[in-house]
């Protein structure tokens, strides 16, 4: 398998599976999927072997490292991949053991005994297990010594003095308090972090109200550590041993992703997924129904319970059909509360991540779904392979500039981006700036160097789009135009019948209508990507031109601000935008400033901005 053939991986925790002929040959976990998988392709040895043999790679997103740890353990145990050679026998897996004693302690073990203790695992990653144990040892005051003495120890251990042990060895532990700590540890290892965090926060509040700030600080640190490693819930298993399937679905315009997770004995052991097209104007229920009909008519085993993320019309009929096929009751339902809603949340998250990955892969291959969507939405004669985006940037009338970016096949072509200094304007005028930039693009030297775009995107509303259309008319060029207004991300469409009307007639044209698309629509996602790039490109150029000299010249006019205060403001605020946007309290916090001086600065900047003429419309 070549690195370029990989799916687009997220930078979040999860499990990855290398397959050959559909069979897993290596399963691993990562805190950062993209980084970890790329490391395998750079390494030799065993990694080099299975990356060359692998024909495909899939991933499962996890909420955090612990959930990834559990998923990895379940999947390795289920599939026993060839290259996970050191982990093939359960007796080699490390477990976490909560001992069966009056005052239990947490230990790592590789032996499971029938001794009444609570065992958690097995886990294939010993280092991750040790990290989990270290956090619990640090944050929960269970004893650390291997055996309780028959008689009191003459003095408490260091852990007791550090607040990391309740001191059962010296009879200092209160049974109820120790029991609560044990229950917290059990809950975390069973994937129930939320109630533990809630109780710790309540205890922290009580301690603070009682002015026991040292205890409140310890509880705060404990909450932060638990949230960092465990999140709020682990979804890789449920409390009871149960067999079920649970589904998640996500949609973006005509594309959709459905993912099905198989849980057996209370643990996730496998997953199936489908990337669907033609899903525009289709509800989530209909998408789920299409998946159910395709998957369960071929499934060799159907569990007694199937959890759905949304209700759909034929669920009861499918439940009846599958019950007859299985010879027992098969229930389909949409959970509303409890740990089963957590399973749906996990599936929904993976469906959304999977959909983003599939769409990003299409974009990387030059088959951006947004191009077809734009063709349909804007009534264009063909897919807009080349898109040019335009935006202006200025602040308080200084250094008025414009930016132009180029996208081909949905991908940025930075080598063809261009910057323009707007000429002859003493004050900001967005419309005139846009008109000048477009006219220069299609009549100057760039007209011969660059091909005509299939679509022009204007960052702005009706006024900016009309200015661009005026410039095109004066230049004698016919190019489809669309605007994107920041408010609600509205599309601004010229021509009675969209951009195609301008192409066909070349007659007088102005903005005819506006269109509001769902935020997940591929056409809107494509335009937002272009808009964001041209905005950042224009702003970065403006900042470069303005520089510290321009900033200092404005600061020189600030009333009541001497050299020392100017230098302090320049050191603290790197741009005039930052200073203008800062609250008075933040300005006053700069060394040498006072609240009165900060208010004076704020009033000066507001008055200066109000005096500058602005483009209307």
UniProtKB/Swiss-Prot annotation:
GO terms for biological process: DNA damage response; nucleotide-excision repair; SOS response. The keyword DNA damage applies. GO terms for molecular function: DNA binding; excinuclease ABC activity. Keywords: Cytoplasm, DNA damage, DNA excision, DNA repair, Excision nuclease, SOS response. It is found in: Cytoplasm. Its main location: cytoplasm. It comes from the Bacteria. One of its GO terms (cellular component) is excinuclease repair complex. Residues 194-229 form the UVR domain. Coiled coil: none annotated. Residues 11-85 form the GIY-YIG domain. CDD domains: GIY-YIG_UvrC_Cho. Belongs to the UvrC family. NCBIfam families: uvrC. The UvrABC repair system catalyzes the recognition and processing of DNA lesions. UvrC both incises the 5' and 3' sides of the lesion. The N-terminal half is responsible for the 3' incision and the C-terminal half is responsible for the 5' incision. Interacts with UvrB in an incision complex. This is UvrABC system protein C. The gene is uvrC.
């Amino acid at each position: 398998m070549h690195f370029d053939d990989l799916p687009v991986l997220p930078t979040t925790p999860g499990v990855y599976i290398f397959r050959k002929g559909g069979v897993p040959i290596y399963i691993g976990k990562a805190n950062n999927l993209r980084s970890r998988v790329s490391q395998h392709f750079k390494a030799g040895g065993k990694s080099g072997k299975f990356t060359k043999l692998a024909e495909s790679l899939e991933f499962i997103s996890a909420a955090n490292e612990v959930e990834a740890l559990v998923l990895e353990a379940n999947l390795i145990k289920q599939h026993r991949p060839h290259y996970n050679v050191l982990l093939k026998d359960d007796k080699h897996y490390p477990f976490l053991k909560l001992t069966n004693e009056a005052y239990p302690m947490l230990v790592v073990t590789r032996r499971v005994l029938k001794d009444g203790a609570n065992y958690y695992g097995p886990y294939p990653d010993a280092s991750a297990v040790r990290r989990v144990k270290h956090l619990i040892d640090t944050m929960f005051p269970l004893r650390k010594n291997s055996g309780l003495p028959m008689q009191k120890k003459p003095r408490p251990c260091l852990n007791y003095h550090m607040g990391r042990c309740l001191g059962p060895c010296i009879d200092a532990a209160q049974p109820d308090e120790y029991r609560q700590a044990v229950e917290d540890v059990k809950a975390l290892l069973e994937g129930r972090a939320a109630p533990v965090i809630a109780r710790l926060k309540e205890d922290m509040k009580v301690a603070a109200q009682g002015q026991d700030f040292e205890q409140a600080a310890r509880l705060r640190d404990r909450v932060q550590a638990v949230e960092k490693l465990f999140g709020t819930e682990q979804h890789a298993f449920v409390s009871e041993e149960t067999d079920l399937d649970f589904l998640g679905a996500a949609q973006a315009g005509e594309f959709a992703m459905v993912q099905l997770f198989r849980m057996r004995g209370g643990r996730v052991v496998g997953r199936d997924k489908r990337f669907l097209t033609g899903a525009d104007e289709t509800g989530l229920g209909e998408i789920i129904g299409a998946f159910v009909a395709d998957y369960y008519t071929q499934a060799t085993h159907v569990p007694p319970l199937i959890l759905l993320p949304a209700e759909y019309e034929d669920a009861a009929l499918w439940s009846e059909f599958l019950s007859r096929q299985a010879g027992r009751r098969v229930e389909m339902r949409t959970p509303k509360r409890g740990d089963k809603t957590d399973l749906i949340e996990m599936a929904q998250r993976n469906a959304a991540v999977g959909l983003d990955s599939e769409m990003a892969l299409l974009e990387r291959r030059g088959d951006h779904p947004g191009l077809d969507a734009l063709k349909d939405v804007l009534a264009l004669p063909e897919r807009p392979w080349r898109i040019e985006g335009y935006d202006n940037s200025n602040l308080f009338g200084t250094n008025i500039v414009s930016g132009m970016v180029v996208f081909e096949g949905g991908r940025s072509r930075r080598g063809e981006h261009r910057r323009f200094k707007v000429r002859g304007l003493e004050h900001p005028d967005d419309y005139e700036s846009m008109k000048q930039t477009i006219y220069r693009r299609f009549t100057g030297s760039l007209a011969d160097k660059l091909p005509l775009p299939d679509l022009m995107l204007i960052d702005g509303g009706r006024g900016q789009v009309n200015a661009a259309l005026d410039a095109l008319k004066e230049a004698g060029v016919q190019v489809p135009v669309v605007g994107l207004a920041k408010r609600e991300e509205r599309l601004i469409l010229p021509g009675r019948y969209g951009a195609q009307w301008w192409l066909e007639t070349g007659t007088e044209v102005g903005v005819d209508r506006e269109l509001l698309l769902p935020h997940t629509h591929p056409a809107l996602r494509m335009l937002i990507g272009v808009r964001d790039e041209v905005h950042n490109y224009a702003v970065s150029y403006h900042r470069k031109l303005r520089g510290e000299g321009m900033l200092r010249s404005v600061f020189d006019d600030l009333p009541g601000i001497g050299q020392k205060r100017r230098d302090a403001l320049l050191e603290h605020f790197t741009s005039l935008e930052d200073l203008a946007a800062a609250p008075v309290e933040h300005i006053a916090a700069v060394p040498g400033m006072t609240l009165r001086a900060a208010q004076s600065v704020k009033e000066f900047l507001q008055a200066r901005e109000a005096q500058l003429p602005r483009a209307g419309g």
